[in-house]
C-alpha cells in the first residue's frame, strides 16, 4: 500500500467513526476526543511544522495508543494534503502525494515480545513507515533521551516528534499537547495530541477501525512493555470475574464489515509468535482480551515494578 492510500484509508475510517449515529456515551465521548485531536493536528501543529517535508517524525511502538494516534495522524495528513491540493492552481488529478514513507522512530528500550516486534514490522509496511529502530545496549534498557538523541543526529531535519502518551500514563498528568523537551533531552518539540483520551476511547476507535491489532491484547495484556516486566492484566483473569464487553456495537459494525456484508464479531488481531505461544503456555490462568478492561486506573496492573 502506498502512503497516500494508507492516509486516505485512515481518513475514511476516521470520517466514518465521526458519522456514527449510534450515540452511546463512549462513542459520543470518543467522537469529541477525535475532534480535539484533529484540531491540535490541523489547526495548531501542521501550521507550525510541515508534515510533508520531514520536520515532523512519529514515535511508534505498536501499542494501542500509538496505533490510534497513527490512524488519526495519517487521516489528518491526507486532509492536509487534500486541502492544499484543492487550493492549488492545478487540478487535483495532477497532484501527487509528496511523501513515500512517514518518518518514524521506534524506541526499543527493552527485550520485546516477538509478537510485538513482528507487529511493528508488519504495520510499518501497512502504513508505509520509514522506521528507525533504536539499538538496545547489550541487552539492557536504553535511555529514552539518548535513543532520541541518536535519532536526531541521523535525522537533523526533525523539529518535532508526535508521541502517543495520555494523561493517565506515568508522568503524563502535567504534560501539554505541544511542549519543548526538558533540558536533559535532545532539543525538539513534543507533540502529544492524545493526552485527553481515556481507555474506553482508545478501545472504541481501535476496534471500530477494523485495523490489525497487536495479538498480545487478545491474550489479556492491556499495557505492553518488555518481556520481563509485562504480564496479562490480573483483573482480566477468567475465574469468578466476568467483565462486560462495552464495545459490541463497534466490533459488529466495524469499518468495512457492512460494505462486505459481514456482521461477525471477529476482531483483527495479529498472530502470536511461536516463542510467545510457548511462553504463554506456562501461564496457569486464562484471560479475557484486553479490551474488556475499561478502568484507566487498572490499565498497568499487569506491569511488574522493578
Swiss-Prot record:
Pathway membership: Cofactor biosynthesis; FAD biosynthesis; FAD from FMN: step 1/1
Recorded GO MF terms: ATP binding; FMN adenylyltransferase activity
Catalysed reactions, semicolon-separated: FMN + ATP + H(+) = FAD + diphosphate
Top-rank taxon, per record: Eukaryota
Keywords, alphabetical: ATP-binding, Cytoplasm, FAD, Flavoprotein, FMN, Nucleotide-binding, Nucleotidyltransferase, Transferase
Binding site for FAD: 59, 107, 164, 182-185, 190, 300
Transmembrane segments: none
GO biological process: FAD biosynthetic process
Enzyme class (EC, first level): transferase
Xref: Gene3D superfamilies: HUPs
Record keyword Nucleotidyltransferase present: yes
InterPro entries: PAPS_reduct_dom, Rossmann-like_a/b/a_fold
One GO cellular component, as annotated: cytoplasm
Keyword Transferase (UniProt): yes
Principal subcellular localization: cytoplasm
Family stated for the protein in its record: Belongs to the PAPS reductase family. FAD1 subfamily.
UniProt function note: Catalyzes the adenylation of flavin mononucleotide (FMN) to form flavin adenine dinucleotide (FAD) coenzyme.
Stated name of the protein: Flavin adenine dinucleotide synthase
Taxonomic classification: Eukaryota, Fungi, Dikarya, Ascomycota, Saccharomycotina
Gene this protein is translated from: FAD1
